[in-house]
Amino acid sequence: MKMMDANEIISFIQKSEKKTPVKVYIKGDLKEVTFPGTVQAFVNKKAGVLFGEWSEIKVILEENKKHIADYVVENDRRNSAIPMLDLKGIKARIEPGAIIRDHVEIGDNAVIMMNATINIGAVIGEGSMIDMNAVLGGRATVGKNCHVGAGAVLAGVIEPPSAKPVIVEDDVVIGANVVVLEGVTVGKGAVVAAGAIVTEDVPPYTVVAGTPARVIKKIDEKTKAKTEIKQELRQLNPEK
C-alpha cells in the first residue's frame, strides 16, 4: 500500500470541484417541469426525488414555483472538496456510520466499526480493526493485523506537507481513547494502554502507558493473551 504524499493531497483538494450535493423530495404538477441531464430526476407526474448540485436544483425550484406544490431538501455538506470512498469493491467489513473519505486504502479483511472517521490519504493494512469512534487523520498509516481501540485518535498531517504522519506498524494493539501525536511511529507488536497520550516513538514489542506514554515493560505471554487479535472477527462471506 502506498502512502499519499502531502503535496498530492493538497493538489487534489485545490483542484477538485467543490460540491454541495442535495437530495430533494418534490411534489406538484411535475409533467410541466423539465429537468436537465445533470440532475438525476426520479419522478412521475405528481411526485419524485431529485439528486444533484444545489446550485442547479435551486434554479429549477425557483423557475417552476407555479408547478411545484412543496419540496424538502436534504443536505449534509457544503462546498465539499473530497467525496466519500466508494465502498462497494472493498474486501473488508465496514459497518454503518463509518465516515471514510476518498483516497483511503483499506486492506483485505480489515474491519471498520460504527462511526469511525478516516481521512484522505490514510492507509489501513489487511486484517486490522478500527474500532467505534476512532479517528485516523490524513495520511495516518496502520499496518497489518492491528487493533485501534474505540475513541482512539491517530493525528493527521496534511499541512505542513513536510511533517511526518503517524505510522503504526504491524501487530500493534492501541487501547481505547489513546491519542497518538503527529510524527510518532508505534513499533511492531507494541501495545499502547487505554487513555495514553503518545508523544514519542514506541519501541517494538513494548507496552506503553500514561500521559505522556512511557515504556512500562516488554511484551510477555500474559500481555499477548490479553491483547490477542481474533481472526474470526475478520472473516468475510465467500465471494460468489
From Swiss-Prot:
<dbReference type="GO" id="GO:0019877">
    <property type="term" value="P:diaminopimelate biosynthetic process"/>
</dbReference>
<dbReference type="InterPro" id="IPR018357">
    <property type="entry name" value="Hexapep_transf_CS"/>
</dbReference>
<comment type="pathway">
    <text>Amino-acid biosynthesis; L-lysine biosynthesis via DAP pathway; LL-2,6-diaminopimelate from (S)-tetrahydrodipicolinate (acetylase route): step 1/3.</text>
</comment>
<keyword id="KW-0028">Amino-acid biosynthesis</keyword>
<keyword id="KW-0677">Repeat</keyword>
<dbReference type="GO" id="GO:0009089">
    <property type="term" value="P:lysine biosynthetic process via diaminopimelate"/>
</dbReference>
<dbReference type="InterPro" id="IPR019873">
    <property type="entry name" value="DapH"/>
</dbReference>
<comment type="similarity">
    <text>Belongs to the transferase hexapeptide repeat family. DapH subfamily.</text>
</comment>
<keyword id="KW-0808">Transferase</keyword>
<dbReference type="Pfam" id="PF08503">
    <property type="entry name" value="DapH_N"/>
</dbReference>
<dbReference type="InterPro" id="IPR001451">
    <property type="entry name" value="Hexapep"/>
</dbReference>
<dbReference type="InterPro" id="IPR050179">
    <property type="entry name" value="Trans_hexapeptide_repeat"/>
</dbReference>
<dbReference type="GO" id="GO:0047200">
    <property type="term" value="F:tetrahydrodipicolinate N-acetyltransferase activity"/>
</dbReference>
<comment type="function">
    <text>Catalyzes the transfer of an acetyl group from acetyl-CoA to tetrahydrodipicolinate.</text>
</comment>
<protein>
    <recommendedName>
        <fullName>2,3,4,5-tetrahydropyridine-2,6-dicarboxylate N-acetyltransferase</fullName>
        <ecNumber>2.3.1.89</ecNumber>
    </recommendedName>
</protein>
<keyword id="KW-0220">Diaminopimelate biosynthesis</keyword>
<dbReference type="InterPro" id="IPR011004">
    <property type="entry name" value="Trimer_LpxA-like_sf"/>
</dbReference>
<dbReference type="Pfam" id="PF00132">
    <property type="entry name" value="Hexapep"/>
</dbReference>
<keyword id="KW-0457">Lysine biosynthesis</keyword>
<dbReference type="InterPro" id="IPR013710">
    <property type="entry name" value="DapH_N"/>
</dbReference>
<dbReference type="Pfam" id="PF14602">
    <property type="entry name" value="Hexapep_2"/>
</dbReference>
<keyword id="KW-0012">Acyltransferase</keyword>
